[in-house]
Amino acid sequence: MIFDVKAPILGFETIHKMRLQKIDEIFLRLNSTEENSVVSFTLVNPFALRKYEFEVPTPLKILLELEGAKSVLVANIMVVQTPIELSTVNYLAPLIFNLDKQLMGQVVLDSNKYPHYHLRENILSHTHE
């Protein structure tokens, strides 16, 4: 599914369309669709790994048309390492997808409001919760 990027991923502000592909129940792949840009992210379903909740800021709710949306997906960027146990997840800057309208964006959470989320957390750090 191809999404219009309404709130850019930090560092990738020139990318306006991205393709999301489900790998399995936990992992997804996000790729740029622009010919002059080869950007690819591995995403992870945070709810499969830990308790995870946050408030979406009102401006992002408006940009992504989340009010009344029936299908919303939250995913986090993962840095894959070998072995997989060394991989890290960015819980402080989740991606939000409005599947109904094919809109997406990244929200950067306030680390003071969410001190239990970090930019680089080991993928296994919450598996025993």
Swiss-Prot record:
SUPFAM superfamilies: BH3618-like (SSF141457). The keyword Transit peptide does not apply. Its main location: cytoplasm. The keyword Ribonucleoprotein does not apply. InterPro entries: Flagellar_assembly_factor_FliW, Flagellar_assmbl_FliW_dom_sf. Coiled coil: none annotated. GO terms for biological process: bacterial-type flagellum assembly; regulation of translation. It is found in: Cytoplasm. Keywords: Bacterial flagellum biogenesis, Chaperone, Cytoplasm, Translation regulation. Pfam families: FliW. Interacts with translational regulator CsrA and flagellin(s). Belongs to the FliW family. PANTHER family: FLAGELLAR ASSEMBLY FACTOR FLIW. Acts as an anti-CsrA protein, binds CsrA and prevents it from repressing translation of its target genes, one of which is flagellin. Binds to flagellin and participates in the assembly of the flagellum. This is Flagellar assembly factor FliW 2. It comes from Helicobacter pylori (strain ATCC 700392 / 26695) (Campylobacter pylori). The gene is fliW2.
